[in-house]
Amino acid sequence: FTPWRIGNCEIKNRIVLTSMGGTDLFGWMEKNHFDKMGARFLREAAKNNAGLVLPGCQPVYNPMFGQWLYKNKKMYEDLKEWMPEFHKTGAKLFVQLTAGFGRSFTISEMMEKLYTNKALRVLSKPFMDLDKITATASPSPNRWSDKVPSREMTREEIHEFVEAFAKSAKLLQDAGVDGVEIHAVHEGYLLDQFTLKYVNHRTDEYGGSFENRYRFAVEIVQAIKKVCGEDFPVSLRYSVLSKTKGFRKGALPGEQFTEVGRDMEESEKAVKYLQDAGYDMLNCDNGTYDAWYWAHPPVYMPENCNLEDVEHIKQFVRIPVVCAGRMNPKTAAESIAAGRLDGAGFARQFLADQEWVTKMMEDREEEIRPCILCHNGCFNMCHYKGVPNDQELSDSLHLSRCAVNAETMQWDRHFIEKTKNPRRVYYRRRNRRDGSCQSVKAS
């Protein structure tokens, strides 16, 4: 719980609430409205001792309705009004801006029908231009569907995105936001697709050599620094290793395989290159959407599954390095104390219990409601019967609900009321340390 700095920005402790889809400040489904439910969640986490808070990623080009983020000035005015309330918590806020998904865009059956029917594709283009949304570094198969392939982005489109990042960052700075995070040379999202040789086969200045493959990410930070100043912090969401064997083929922990994406030799070079380009922090994990479980670890992934690789690349940079991915708080604290890490990233645990950091600080760990790593409410690719995610379509993306906390992001629908008829009850409580149970009486 010691302070640290990202550039000139001081963060009160080492706990980082990392981005999750659905915790956005600007909703996607209603043309980038200011999302009060997302804002409430973020403030609750900040109030309960998250030091650095990162909302869900904001596309600089909205895949719904095709609107550029910098063009809707009203939501920045709403954000500016809200920021003083947030800053009362003592936390800092970095808004995560994304270039989008490229070939990783999740394709539903409805989208397949829209794309494969020429008439429907034309009619749907004003509100969902799948051809533009799924464009990537080079022609590639979509991660989820064989029916919606990704075309190559044009140079003009790349330049449009670079300009949009700079304009959006400046508006966020003027609204009082403490910094931005660029999404992402991470998890096989669009920017990452440009860096990965198995996706990028371009022959222009955005493909081929190492410098060309990382050019898109470099131009973004340089454009932001030009309009916001060198002191405005810019973090980068970064996957150390791709852990990928090929399209739709991910590697498992301990598996011997040939890496088709970013290996450690390239990563050691890349982190220094990106630091020297102007990035002020690396927010790290592993994986691509072809190996998605490294960045969104389910229950069968080991604790701290990305920590060893993240600790390794910290040796090659001077800027702060954060690690996320099923982090154990005590292990993270040991790594930070030893100087092998600067910050610890947590995400879904905040959905399960927004007060968990406060409870840990007050030695009330037995009261923490743990994330059970099920993905049922927080990850919309995992829709089982009885899924706890009952959002309406007008909500942002059907994400960031929780199987063990019905109130999270649904306070207007699910809330606990004090009973008018109190009774004594008995229940069995499990000790999180040794697994033993005890009977407890409560009123």
Please report, for each region that a protein language model flagged, where it lies by residue:
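Flavin-dependent oxidoreductase catalytic cores
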Residues: 1-443
